[in-house]
Amino acid sequence: GLLGLGYGGYGGYGGYGGYGHGLALAAAPAAIAAPAVVAAPAIAHAPAVAVAPAVAHAPAAVSTVSQVSYGTTHYAPAVAKVAAIAAPVAVAAPAIAAAPAVGLGYGGYGHGLSLGYGHGLGLGYAAAPALSLGYGGYGHGLGYGGYGYGHH
């Protein structure tokens, strides 16, 4: 994987815009409304295995990425239009778009750095174990490996 620059960073993904390889530039929607009231559990269980497509090739561009930050644990994007290829939608989080964010990462699934407004800073290796420090979205706080403390 090379550098991935896209809309919607995810701690365990390290910049979902890259989608594995190459450089992908995403056009963020003009406005995404985050839910005003969110029921975030004190302990959010991260999926044991993140849904990762077997395809390792990078698409030319990322159109839109809807992502969820659930109780300070950042899950996989729920919907992603990647050129003509759609990312898997079978994720553990509901398909609700969180606050706008910019993801910058090395590689696609598994490891890298994700930095953005609304999701904050995420650093993780493998999909589930990830250190996520974020502000905005569903919750604020610190989460590690799917377990985190957060408030909204």
Swiss-Prot record:
Q: Which residues form a coiled coil?
A: none
- Is Repressor among the key words of this record? no
Q: Where are the sequence repeats?
A: 27-30, 33-37, 39-42, 86-89, 92-95, 98-101, 127-130
Keywords for the protein's UniProt record, in alphabetical order: Cuticle, Repeat
Q: Name one GO molecular function term.
A: structural constituent of cuticle
Which spans are transmembrane here?
none
Purpose of the protein: Component of the cuticle of migratory locust which contains more than 100 different structural proteins.
Domain comment as written in the entry: The tetrapeptide (A-A-P-[AV]) repeats found throughout the protein are also present in many proteins constituting the protective envelope of other species.
Protein name, entry field: Cuticle protein 64
